[in-house]
Amino acid sequence: MSYPFAPRSRRRMLALGARTLGVGAAAALGLAACGTSDNRSDATETTPASNDAKDIAADAYVFGYPLVLMDVTRETGGPANQFVHQNPPTPEVRQVVRLNLDTLYSQAWLDLRPEPMVLQVPAIETGRYWLMQFLDAWSNTVHDPASTNPRVKNAPQQPPYTYLVTGPGWKGTVPEGMTQLAMPTGTTWLLGRIEYQGEADIEHVRAIQHRLKLAPLSVWNSDGVQGGPGALAASSSAPAQMVGAMDGPTFFARMCAVMAANPAHEDDVDAMKRFATIGITPGGAATVPADVLNAGLADGRRALTEYRDPKSQYQNGWLFNLEVGAYGTDYPLRAQVAALGLGANLPRDAVYPTIDGNADGDSRFRVTFAQDQLPPVGAFWSLTAYDSESYLVQNSARIYSVGHLVPLSPAEDGTITIAVQNAEPGPEVPAGHWLPIPESGRFSLTLRLYAPKDSVLNGKWEVPKLEKLS
């Protein structure tokens, strides 16, 4: 089972585009080439596509990587059309990096080919954030009903919210009281998130999870079983490792098979025509030798690990990307985000600026929000620290994030300062204002902004600097 965390094998890649590389397959596809300056402001350019079979295979790998990874993840994600709920994360977890301590996940892999599925989100108390994210088979986020905007149409504006999730080509009638969520692929990943507020809140959130309803349309509101939630399960990074172990013939055979059930988007027609020249088609088989496929796969993998995303933004040292979640024909970005961790949110739902730092003995840092300049969000925000391997920072105070659970206290001038350091700062720092980091070595901070407001998305609000005091 996989959640939208970076798998352990990718733990050095701390943010979208953070360990970025060259152009590789992007140029061969005629996509925007990447700048190489530190500020990433270089103008983009295009390069004619290569007709070499190895280059085509490399580009096909970048194109198809999210599809294959999604399919392998689906196989490890439990029975189709049933919820599986995540265990509450703990600081001792070492299988998953960059743990999210703010929400619990509920996932279901939907097979929409036989008929539509119905999802009902129960009444949840005002102020508790939730998000139901629907990804197509290519890892694009297509729908995102949430507590901040349930996105209902021709249906009651009050909970419970009932959604009819339909596959491509469905032409039935939407029952009264339901909002249709049309998906472009028969395979759909439903990834739900519900805010939880520490250990004492876990049982309450579990109760909410078990009130989520999911069932085929044919048995909805009938005597049929409503597809109750599955057992709690732990996360795993196995799918990425499994795809990483595939050779060229295996990968491209899998890609062709999955495309037969989940065709590419109509905007991908030029890429698909090019791939067809070496037999990579929906339901097809590659027509070039295995050594060419293996060489192309190796080049494609190298392209992903060397890709520099020109759309990544730097703001006072923080790195983030406002172009993720839905990718259009930006195949390198789509593949890179999938490699970092499937399930990236649309920016309107969440933005995760990340910054790296280096502690040396008694190093002290701080993050200061100016008066009335706390992160502008429609839900909530948190700041979490990670060690050099992207695990939570072990500390005797068991403080791993700030901003969400304990209210922050402004100083006399209205500013709010977070002390970022290993040593306990003492009584002069209010409760909730200390974020422990490692005593020495590399560390990173992630600022999670849930339902960011327009001022975040248009750049009018900036993340404050991480200042080193000693």
PLM segments and residue spans:
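N-terminal secretory signal peptides
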Residues: 1-30
